[in-house]
């Protein structure tokens, strides 16, 4: 934590990523407050002065080095940094989307939150309109938001997307495109320095960038924790089943952690058939491999 300039970090949520960003903001606020209180206690003990005086001196230093004239709030109390960046999202009648950033972000380390799989109604036009967006709508909303951030002078842009769009199009058959790689390169060319995503469909996508860094996080601990509250993970009949070959490595981790056997489904598909939803599958045959 930088005590002289605690507001360099900025979080900007696209309409699809608002709920996710709210949880991160709450966690950030808690972390910063705990670190501040710990810093105050250590400094007070070291210099044998009161915590109130340390708090006042830290606030004074923050005011001196802040780009603002002065940081709002009581100088004798902890002043929480303001991470949230406000923006106005406009949906036009012809389907175009516009992002207008309402706060200064010049020189900030900006994190843009977007959940392209969000199917809940998203608010536009100052909350007057609500619309359910497709993946393509969310992607376009992300692009115009990135552009607005660049035009507003953000120093660094990190894109936080729990679901990486078009990640299943990471390999091609015949004359198909490699859309997963191309979309990532579009983000890179726009000026995004880093993408943070969760359990990306294929790690091959990480190799399609020149300078952009893709961080593929895993929710393994959280999954096991929730699973332990639902079933008996110590059951001797428990087997970890990988739904396809692409998920084998991920399921190997769960099998080894839970010390359970691993099985796998091998699927054969009819690629001449285009599926519309989960009930309309192009899978022609499935084989269960493993001792269950």
Where are these regions (language model features)?
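PRPP-associated nucleotide enzymes
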Residues: 1-292
């Amino acid at each position: 934590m930088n005590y002289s300039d605690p507001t360099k970090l900025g979080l900007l949520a696209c309409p699809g990523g608002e709920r996710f960003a709210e949880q991160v903001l709450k966690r950030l606020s808690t972390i910063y407050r705990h670190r501040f209180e710990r810093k105050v206690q250590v400094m007070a003990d070291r210099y044998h002065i009161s915590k109130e005086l340390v708090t006042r001196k830290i606030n004074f230093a923050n005011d001196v080095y802040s780009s603002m004239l002065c940081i709002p709030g009581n100088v004798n109390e902890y002043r929480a940094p303001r991470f949230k960046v406000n923006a106005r999202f406009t949906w036009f009648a012809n389907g175009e989307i516009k992002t207008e950033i309402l706060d200064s972000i010049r020189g900030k380390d900006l994190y843009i939150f977007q959940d392209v799989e969000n199917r809940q109604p998203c608010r536009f036009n100052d909350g007057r309109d609500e619309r359910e967006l497709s993946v393509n709508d969310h992607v376009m909303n992300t692009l115009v938001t990135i552009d607005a951030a660049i035009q507003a002078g953000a120093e660094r842009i990190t894109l936080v997307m729990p679901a990486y769009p078009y990640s299943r199009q990471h390999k091609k058959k015949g004359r198909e495109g490699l859309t997963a790689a191309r979309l990532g390169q579009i983000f890179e060319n726009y000026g995004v320095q880093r993408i943070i995503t969760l359990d990306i469909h294929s790690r091959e996508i990480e190799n399609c960038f020149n300078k952009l860094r893709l961080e593929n996080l895993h929710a393994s601990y959280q999954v096991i924790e929730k699973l332990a509250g639902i079933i008996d993970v110590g059951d001797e009949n428990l087997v970890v089943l990988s739904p396809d070959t692409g998920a084998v490595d991920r399921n190997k981790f769960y099998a080894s952690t839970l010390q359970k056997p691993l099985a796998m489904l091998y699927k054969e598909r009819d690629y001449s058939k285009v599926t519309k939803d989960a009930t309309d599958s192009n899978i022609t045959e499935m084989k269960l491999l493993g001792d269950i």
